[in-house]
Amino acid sequence: MRDVVPGCQYVGMTDAPRETGPGADLPQLDDDAVLWSAPPEERAGRPLLVLLHGYGSNENDLFALAPYLPPAFVIAAVRAPLSPPFPTPGWSWFPIEGLHASDATAATAAAEAFASWLRGATDATTPVGLLGFSQGSVIALQALRLDPSRFAFVVNLAGFVADGDLPTDGELAELRPPVFWGRGARDEVIPAARVAHTIDWLPRHVELSGRVYPGLTHSVSEEELADVVAFLGKQLDALPARE
C-alpha cells in the first residue's frame, strides 16, 4: 500500500528500526530529517504547522504542499520513526496491521514519540496545528487526544481515529478544537469500520468540518487542497495576536 499525494517522493529501504509488535517502544524522531519552511531566526512569534506523512512515504511527501499553504505558518515536515518490512519503501508510524486491529497501543506510542519531538522543537507558547495524511492523520488525532490543550487544530486527510478510550478524551470533548476531515468517496485503503468509527467519534469530541470528495481515491486532490487552505486561513484568523 502507498499513500499518494501530488508531488510525493518515495525512498528505498534503510537501516532504520524495523516495525515490531504494537507494544514495542518507538525510537525518537530524527530531528535531522525534519524539513522546515523557515530557518530558526525566522520562526519566532509565528504559528507552527506540522505535517505527518502516511505509511511507506517520507517527509518530502507532504512538504511538497508547503508552497500552497498559508505563508504565515512555519511548516515542519517530520519523518516517521519506523521502516516498514520489505518491499515497502519509506517510513511508518506503526505496523500496517494497525489498520484493522482494535489495539491502539502502537498509535499511542507513536503519538507520544511525536509529542516528545515537538517539546524539543518549539516552546510551549507557540500555537501548533497538525496536518496528517492517512497513517499520519491517525498520529495527529492521537496526539490531539493525548494533549488536547496543546494543539490549535488538526487537518485529517484520508485518516481515522484510533480505537479505544484515553483519559484525556473528556477534556478534548470540552475544548472541542476544530478538525477538518477530508476523504475520498472511492478510498479503498482505509477499512470501512475505521471510517464508521471516525464518523461516530469525531463529532462528539471536536468541532468537525470537512468533505467527502466524489471520485477521489486514497490521495489528495486540488479541490481538497483548496478546502484545506481555506480551513487553515480560518484557523489563522482565530489565533490570538502575539507580540
Regions found by a protein language model. Give the residues of each.
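Flexible "cap/lid" loop of the alpha/beta hydrolase fold
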Residues: 87-95, 99, 159-179
